[in-house]
């Protein structure tokens, strides 16, 4: 049996290292590749190759992030590591690398620090479902200070539980020692990856979720009816399925009478495919770009929500001035821009470029929204921020 086919059959998981600056996130990422390269499951990547991160763009925002690939016996992992705190905030909020779980790296010598707390909160707001903790720099702790590590652990458990992360496994080790080849500490990194394998479940594949397709374009075919086109976000749609058109106007129900791809008729369309759907009894003026076609009652139109937002700095092409309650930019969801009115939380007078903030939005027309969904904030055609819906209000 060739190795290639074996690799493709492993479930794929996206994870990332999060935590306070200088607690050892990048060193740990390198140490994981070192530990697994011994089993032929990873190519060893040294610190500088990960730290020298390429720039990428997500929703118009530049993010520095390194993507490292490796495998355990059971899974294939794509691991994201960011150099700066602002890059983490942007990466998590824009969903540039959507995480199925995260490894929270905490230095045993410092314990939980401000960014540790901020990353845990951010992970909760953007819907990172599971966290495994690596208590790093254990080699720096003297025997008489050993009890301090227990206190650090207790504080971490409390912090995590407060944000809804219960029963997170905590592995103690030293990323640097593992990277230097110390066998006992390499074993600790393996233990960490075993905990990741065991505690971060394989996510449901997009294909198994309820059907949804954002509409990009609408046109009529004489004698046949109205066709809507787009890329299927999730699920499967078959000819003669009942579907709903949701967003921007009143929800309508219809039946799919044809599925086409590259002008060929298909029995079904699947997640990830670009298709045209022929809809029964729907006029060209009944439907528009920005609505979604979906499994009936799987998504509802909403106008009001709470969100976690990163506001671009001036240098990133963002605003030059702060904004206040009553600010009315465009919110870009999937394929549509809708104007919304911002209400800042009590005690926050204004939002400055570069801030990471939570606020409420009231849209002027209803859109098919879900918690955890990403969006861009635009003003005059340029992106000035990005966000994730943390809670739907109405």
Curated annotation (Swiss-Prot):
The keyword Cell inner membrane does not apply. PANTHER family: ELONGATION FACTOR TU, MITOCHONDRIAL (PTHR43721:SF22), ELONGATION FACTOR TU-RELATED (PTHR43721). Its main location: cytoplasm. Residues 10-204 form the tr-type G domain. GO terms for biological process: translational elongation. The lineage of its organism: Bacteria, Pseudomonadati, Chlamydiota, Chlamydiia, Chlamydiales. Residues 136-139 are annotated as: G4. This is Elongation factor Tu.
